[in-house]
Each structure stands twice: as structure tokens, then as C-alpha cells.
Amino acid sequence: MKTTISLALAGVLATSLVCAGNLTEKRTEKAKAVIAAAVEAHGGEKLEGLKTLIVETEAVNYAVGQSRGAEPPWDESESVAVDAIDLDNSIFINRGTFNGGGFEGYGGTIINGEDSYQLDYRAGTAAPVAEPDFATASGPFVRVTPALLVRTLKDRETNAYYLGEETIDGKDYDVVGFSMTVGPAITAYFDKEDHMLRRSERIFPGAGLVQYEFLDYNMVDGIAINQVFNFYVNGDPNLERKIVKAKVNAPLDEHLVVDANLQRIPVVEPDPLTRQEVADGVWLIGGNGTYAMFVDMGDYIFAAGGTAGIPERIESLREVADKPVKYGMLTHHHFDHVMGVTAYEAEGAKLITAAAHETVAREAATDGGTLKIKTVKDRMKLEANGRTVEIIDIGPTAHTEHLLVAYLPEEGILFEADHFSLPEDGPIPPAVSSTPVSYT
């Protein structure tokens, strides 16, 4: 009897596996068919023969989650850019200007093997790129350019998967999921009527659902180029970009030139995680521009900073001070500065945040309802074991309406984030709007 049941069960499982295999095969083949139709719609042989693309753009940015205020309406800023790519030789170039959040920029990136540079025209510097990565650098440009995205999808069709049909705003779409070389998986929506890529989306860690919208296609030398691109973060408009000019298979020589008047400065090496004891019982731990400060208060640790990587920084701290983290201070509400909320939450620490940022902090937590929070409206003071930490809201600033800093008066140490920035090396760039403002 047991043998009979086992054989019957084996037969059922085998049938299930065959059905599952057939379904997977069907969805893979359907994805290939959708991709083939999309390639033809976006230029066919012309698209397959695409070697270089140069795109000049103008954009309006809506700083979702990155504005001076924690709620809409979001701050607006403008930018202009030139992006150029050589698919055969793995070359990518970006140059552009931007302003927003109290900062202004005019710079660029050249990824070209050993001749790769980070350019800062405001500072007048050119820094070699230590580890040039074509896929990572060009990825954002590829994701917002349907011709390149469809080309990439064709090249990676073996990992594409048909997700089904969707109707959005009365329009029917074939939906295909796939992964690029780097970054989260992408879901692409192709119009069932003309097979054009109209939308895509992916989940971006720390930000949530990001959506791409492609409008107003024109043919440029036989290749479909969208004239308008819109970007959304969790449904909120984040970027509206218009293409001013596009060139297909044009040489990139002029874009590869590094201006002779730029000062060559040393290569900017990746900054590994390091721990520095900047004063007795005060540690600065971090790397690559993201740091947290930890202060020994006797029976507990006070921590300042909420960027990504807080768990690794706490782990490093435990090597020299195995004490509970009682407080974790967030400098401000921007999404890249609340990524550490869950780490402090897991430690059982009480979060210190500006009163206006409490809602954002709770939304960033695993369980916002039980998150322990101490809000600051002007300033507060922690005193323990003969040590003082003053937490001060220095807002409003050009970057955010409320910005907490941690000040250790006896040690003369101040911890801040995004109030001002300094170059890695070379000359100090001209002042930006956040620099000349004084606070008392």
C-alpha cells in the first residue's frame, strides 16, 4: 500500500513539475516574442546597429523626500545635461549643471577605461576614477532611455520573464520583468497596439516604488527616441525631462576631452569602513562619505547619524565599546538620512529627531507605532559620566528647514550632515547658497 501511494505521489509530483516547467517555458517564450516586437517597433535593424547615442536634456526636479520641508509641495530645481554612450567600447560620459537643497553643481563623469575622470568645473578639478564601472555609471542613462533599455532587454532576454497583461488608464500592456547587470529588477510595460515601451518600474531600496514614463516618441535616424520622460517616487512626480537634441551613431571624441584648464588631482579611492577615535570615548565610524559618531556616555552610547550602514558601524563600535546604544540622533528627514532608523529600532534605542520629522522617522521604522522617539524643537542636552552632548536644531538652512547637529563643547567636536561639503582634494570650490549664511 505504501509503495502504491508513493508511486502515485511521485506521479502527481512529476506531473506538477512538468506543468510548472511548461508554464515557465511558455512565459519565457512569450517574453522573447514581446521583446522581438519591441525591438522592431523601436527601430529594428537600426536599433540593433546602434553604437553610440548622444542626448542633450533639460529637466525639472521635484525633490520628493529630499526637500527643505518634510511634506509637499516639494522643492523644484532645474538641470541641464549631456549624456553620451558608446555601447561597443563601454564608454559613458555625463556632463551637467544642477542646483537644489542649498547646493550647486557643474561637473561630469567620463568612463573610458584607464582614461576615466570625475570632473568638477566649479572647483576646477579632474580626478581619475579609481575603479571605473561602465555598467554602474551608465545604468541610470540606460534606464531612462527606451532605445537603450530595449537593446539591453534584447541582450538579456534569457533572464526575461513574461508577467502577464495589465490595463492602465484604459490602455493594455504586455508586462515583462528582467534584470540589468546591476541594480534592482525592472518591470517593463509595452503597449499591446504598437509595442512601444511606455512605462517601467522597480523597487529602489530606501525610496520604495520608482516609476518611469516615456512619452512623445520621434524617429531619429530610424530609432525611436522619446522626447519626454517622467519619473515618479511612490506615485509623486520627481522628475520631468525633455530631450533637446539626440544624435545617433555620432563620434564621441569631443565629449571625451578633459579641459586643459582643469587641475589634475589625485585619484579618489574608495573609502573603506574605518573607525577613528577623535577624542577619548568619541568615535567616527564610516566610509565613502557616510559616517556616524558614537559617544561613550558611561553606561550607554549616544549615536549621531542615520544613513545607510548603521548596523556595520555599530558592529565596529562593539569592538571597542560593548555598551547599549541608548539614543540614535537623525540629522534630518531626507530618505538617505533615515535609512538607519531600523538599525536603531533593533537596538532598542530611542530616536532623537526634529519634531517636524517625527512622522518621517516613524514611516521609516519597522513598527512606527512602537518606535521610541524624543523630539527636539530647539535644543536639548544629554549629560552623563561628566560628558555633555548638546543637540541643536540649526534650521532653517538652505538644505532643510530643520537640521540637528550634535555638539560636544568640552571636546570641541560638532557632528553635522549635508550642511556643507568639502572636496576630497584640490582647491575649495566657490561658495554655494548654504555656505555664506551664518547661524547664532
Regions found by a protein language model. Name each.
Residues 37-124, 159, 164:
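N-terminal mature ectodomain segment of secretory-pathway/periplasmic proteins
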Residues 8-16:
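Bacterial N-terminal signal peptides
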Residues 238-298:
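Zn-dependent metallo-beta-lactamase
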Residues 275-315, 403-422:
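Conserved beta-strand hairpin/beta-sheet module of binuclear metal-dependent hydrolase folds
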Residues 49-56, 88-95, 169-177, 195-199, ...:
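Short, hydrophobic/aromatic-rich segments at coil-to-beta transitions
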Residues 26-33, 110-185, 194, 204-208, ...:
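Flexible, processing/modification-adjacent segments and terminal tails
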Residues 308-352:
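Active-site metal-binding motif and surrounding structural segment of the metallo-beta-lactamase
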Residues 169-257, 407-409, 416-417, 422-423, ...:
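Gly/Pro-enriched, hydrophobic low-complexity segments
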